[in-house]
Curated annotation (Swiss-Prot):
Lineage of the species this protein comes from: Bacteria, Pseudomonadati, Pseudomonadota, Betaproteobacteria, Burkholderiales
Regulation: Inhibited by fructose 1,6-bisphosphate (FBP).
CDD domains according to UniProt: FGGY_EcGK_like
Pfam families tied to this protein: FGGY_C, FGGY_N
Function: Key enzyme in the regulation of glycerol uptake and metabolism. Catalyzes the phosphorylation of glycerol to yield sn-glycerol 3-phosphate.
UniProt KW keywords: ATP-binding, Glycerol metabolism, Kinase, Nucleotide-binding, Transferase
Superkingdom assignment: Bacteria
Single biological process term from Gene Ontology: glycerol-3-phosphate metabolic process
Protein's name in the database: Glycerol kinase
Length: 497
């Protein structure tokens, strides 16, 4: 049996998973990652703690699997995207804490770019909207606000990277300063049409080109780990940002295939093939994980409050003691009794982009119970995802592509059968839950397996993908459309006059 190791560095934890060549999990390990909140709206991580926890889980996973590093054919890395690290090339020490993707400190820079009328330029090159979410403005903040850093950067003494770059630098002892196209595409500095750092965008934000890592395909021979770290050198063969890695792990290799990750929020990606498409529905264009030097693209949208609405039921309303109780409570009534919840706790993301929206619960009567509210809360996740998917389908159809035929799902909340069935009903297409739901880590393992010869092609990987359960729609198209109309009416009520 051949084995692959996936390093899955996330926002709240570092994880490592050993897979066999059939895509089965052999062993896994996880360590929590402390969050640092220096000011309201600021979120940081300690880069050395990221490295320490990731290395520790890799060692633990190998130990649990009863394997040595020499038994591992290759290693893949997947990571929280956009989070920004700058370090000294000579020592490998960071100059500051990592600025996490959720951090909003660069909003003033983004406002200036909008005032300068740079939105069309940036979207045409990067596929992104101007937002503090992306790495470029975080990097500018570090250059402008950490004493001495700009001068050091201009002398070529510093390196920038997203978390994948940082881990590869540490794994190789500084021999490798690289990233993959999917992570590069989230910086707002990378031209996704040419697959290169964009000189005009670097100049716009005042970023020296010497800071930037080499960009490689997501499946490639990156280098090897230092032998002393794990007991033997392991080839680094695959790298992708978490959402693109999940798309790959779901075997969504062809245009029109899509996945939705149901976590605290929801992340939906649709593969759009080799043609760059600009969304007319408020979605992002991003690089998909690439196995060759030729660009491949995906359309992306995110729901801010997905599974977090269940946490609110528990912690805010005290309607449930634990998140696992929500399905039974919601199933204790046949429907929501006319109750509609729009959980716009932090505004609404794609496709609405209403930052000033606030959460609402409508349709309450004397007969409304906590079970109706729980059901409406669960259904809100499906409504938001359906609105996002319908926007993606409109973009696909307008560019001459076929609408989506099925949706593949992953993430913690996809275990909720009630939610998945309602999602299929709203969309009118099958919803497929995979046998292996650790699709983010699996994607990294697949990418490493391709470059190291474990797999011959993505066709072989497609043949390995298995659904654990398929949810078929049980509602007619007219009934589903009526429900979506009620949802859109509720969304319009979230912005106060």
């Amino acid at each position: 049996m051949t084995y692959l190791l996936a390093l899955d560095q996330g926002t709240s934890s570092s994880r490592s998973i050993v897979f066999d060549e059939l895509g089965h999990i052999v062993a896994q390990a996880q360590q929590e990652l402390p969050q640092i909140y220096p000011k309201p709206g600021w979120v940081e991580h300690d880069p050395m703690e990221i490295w320490r926890t990731q290395l520790a889980t890799a060692r633990e996973a190998l130990g649990k699997a009863g394997l040595k590093a020499s038994d591992i054919r290759a290693l893949g890395i997947t990571n929280q995207r956009e989070t920004t690290v700058v370090w000294h090339r000579a020592t490998g020490q960071p100059i500051h804490n990592a600025i996490v993707w959720q951090d909003r400190r660069a909003e003033a820079t983004c406002a200036q770019l909008r005032e300068q009328g740079k939105e069309a330029l940036i979207q045409s090159k990067t596929g992104l909207l101007i937002d503090a979410y992306f790495s470029g403005t975080k990097l500018k903040w570090l250059l402008d606000n950490v004493p001495g850093v700009r001068a050091q950067a201009e002398r070529g003494e510093l390196a920038f990277g997203t978390i994948d770059s940082w881990l590869m630098w540490q794994l190789t002892g500084g021999a490798l300063h690289a990233t993959d196209v999917s992570n590069a595409s989230r910086t707002m500095l990378f031209n996704v049409r040419t697959n290169q750092w964009d000189a005009e965008l670097l100049d716009l934000l005042g970023i020296p080109a010497s800071l930037m890592p080499q960009v490689l395909p997501s499946s490639a021979h990156y280098g090897e780990t230092r032998p002393e770290l794990l007991g033997h050198a392991i080839a680094i063969g695959g790298v992708a940002g978490d959402q693109q890695s999940a798309l790959f792990g779901q075997a969504c290799f062809k245009a029109g295939m899509a996945k939705n990750t149901y976590g605290t929020g929801c992340f939906m990606l649709m593969h759009t093939g080799t043609q760059f498409q600009t969304s007319h529905n408020g979605l992002l264009t991003t690089s998909a994980a690439q196995t060759t030097a030729h660009p491949e693209f995906a359309m992306e949208g995110s729901v801010f409050v997905g599974g977090a609405v269940v946490q609110w039921l528990r912690d805010g309303l005290h309607a449930i003691q634990g998140s696992g109780e929500v399905q039974a409570l919601a199933q204790s009534v046949p429907d929501s009794g006319g109750v509609m919840m729009v959980p716009a706790f932090t505004g609404l993301g794609a496709p609405y982009w209403k930052p000033d929206a606030r959460g609402t619960i409508t349709g309450l009567t004397r007969g409304t119970t906590v079970a109706h509210i729980a059901r409406a809360a669960l259904e809100s996740i499906a409504y938001q995802s359906a609105a996002l998917l319908q926007a993606m389908s409109r973009d696909a159809v307008s560019s001459g592509a076929a609408p989506l035929a099925e949706l593949r799902v992953d993430g913690g909340a996809c275990a909720n059968d009630l939610l998945m069935q309602f999602q299929a009903d709203l969309l009118g297409i099958p919803v497929l839950r995979p046998a292996v739901i650790e699709t983010t880590a699996l994607g990294a393992a697949y990418l490493a397996g391709l470059s190291s010869g474990v797999y011959r092609s993505t066709d072989e990987l497609s043949g390995m993908w298995r659904a654990e359960r398929t949810f078929l729609p049980t509602l007619g198209a007219d009934s589903a459309a009526a429900l979506m109309n009620r949802w859109e009416h509720a969304v319009r009520q979230t912005v106060l006059p």
